[in-house]
């Protein structure tokens, strides 16, 4: 009986000690692994409010002293440079085309590519947008796509601007690299500067004298559009090749008066029949001479 009592007491004391030890252990905080909420925000993830060098505070001389006159001067000048309306930039990728011959002049839309462009034009018409500007890449497939779209929307063809900066190219070496597409470093050097210049030409917040929201239609190319999306949203531009957009798709970016940028559509082709959804050159017509 004594042995049993001693065993029971020993076991109870052991369990009590174990319980008290566990009770006093510090509790580890549980975090959702994907949020990284226990770490400070990486500097590269912070939004650059002056990305276009048009932040109103950067355009006005700062306050020099605490005098009310100086503060009034600052507020008055600041009010004059504050945008009041948004800029909507709608990007259209060209339709499916034939990679025939060695020059751009022979790279015409396929019949399906022409139909894709018509569907896109009809969709843009349905959206009821009042266009302020229509600008097209000077490459044949973009010109043909723009011409078909213009038959469907309310915009005079004579007012269309052509821009060589929007031509297709290699914007920046992608991450991760891919084995099937490796342009020379010289091509990235040449095309990258041009495509970045195109971004700076068309992406900026509204000027203070803009009296209403504006709508700009850009007809261009897959690589250029994907690079623009990354740059506008301040994602790493090297990520552009991780995005895939269909032929004649609609991508819609909005630059608010504050300079914040949001995306409404990314490569939208939901308005097309499924047999018209393509994103690559037809294999049977690739590099045909």
From Swiss-Prot:
Classification via PANTHER family: PHOSPHOGLYCERATE MUTASE-RELATED (PTHR20935), SERINE_THREONINE-PROTEIN PHOSPHATASE PGAM5, MITOCHONDRIAL (PTHR20935:SF0)
GO MF term list: phosphoprotein phosphatase activity; protein serine/threonine phosphatase activity
Top enzyme category: hydrolase
Record function comment: Displays phosphatase activity for serine/threonine residues, and dephosphorylates and activates Pk92B kinase. Has apparently no phosphoglycerate mutase activity.
Name the record gives this protein: Serine/threonine-protein phosphatase Pgam5, mitochondrial
Bilayer disposition of the protein: Single-pass membrane protein
Classification via InterPro entries: His_Pase_superF_clade-1, His_PPase_superfam, Mito_Ser/Thr_phosphatase
Organism: Drosophila pseudoobscura pseudoobscura (Fruit fly)
Description of how the protein assembles with itself and partners: Interacts with Pk92B/ASK1.
Family: Belongs to the phosphoglycerate mutase family. BPG-dependent PGAM subfamily.
Protein EC: 3.1.3.16
Organism phylogeny: Eukaryota, Metazoa, Ecdysozoa, Arthropoda, Hexapoda
Alphabetical keyword list: Hydrolase, Membrane, Mitochondrion, Mitochondrion outer membrane, Transmembrane, Transmembrane helix
Classification via Pfam families: His_Phos_1
Gene Ontology cellular component list: mitochondrial outer membrane
Keyword Hydrolase listed: yes
